Amino acid sequence: MELKNVYRGDEVKFAALFRALQPALLADFIAAHPDFQVGAKFFGVPYYQNPNGENAVLYNEINAWKIAGIKHDKYGLMTSFRPQYPTAFALVEAFGDACQMAGYSIVEPNAIIYRHTGVENRDAKSIRIHIPLYVPEGDIGFEVEGEIVLWDDVFSFNNQKLHSVWNNTPDRRLVLLIDLSREICELPPAPAHFPGCNAHVPVFEKTRDPNYS
């Protein structure tokens, strides 16, 4: 099925590179966190994040979404983690300033990340890429403006469009997120975010916040 809001597989610039690195990216992470599924602790993505007009609360349970950082959008490379994640650091450094942000992204079991947009990319000059590393079987997925995407291949999207995640399985999900400039990905410019720019998007019931209208 053709998607309007998502680039998938070979539509993603550098897809072959990302696929080739998947085993090493996962191996580094598991070596650093052998208890990944049963006890390893990571930094929680802030629970309150988004401006008026979008969900103020980001997910259904505090710390449902966690990150193991490689490059911060404001503070740059998080070099203290280089020994743990050598493949990810090599990848990010190869892109230089064209990479705005990168990190391992963990979604907890039975978690919903409500619809949101990326506060770090308001000018929409970057595109967010998902490199799937461990995806549980079962009821799990991702949507952008109602278009459903599975983590069966690399994909990218404009994170200024409303998007959400659900993981109705007993396991954690792991992907590497990397934000690259649209220019290096040979993509045309995208409009910058502005208040109300997503007001036209219909509700997506599967991840709808029951406390938000």
Predicted feature descriptions by range:
Residues 161-176:
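Ligand-binding loop in jelly-roll beta-barrel domains
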Residues 131:
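Basic nucleic-acid-binding interfaces
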Residues 147-162:
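Conserved metal-binding segment of the jelly-roll/cupin
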Residues 136, 164, 181-185:
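Short coil/turn motifs at secondary-structure junctions
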Residues 1-125, 134, 138, 144, ...:
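Fe(II)/2-oxoglutarate oxygenase catalytic core
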Residues 156, 177-179:
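A general secondary-structure boundary signal
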Residues 145-148, 181-182:
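Short, solvent-exposed aromatic-acidic interface loops
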Residues 124-128, 150-151:
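Trp-centered recognition loops
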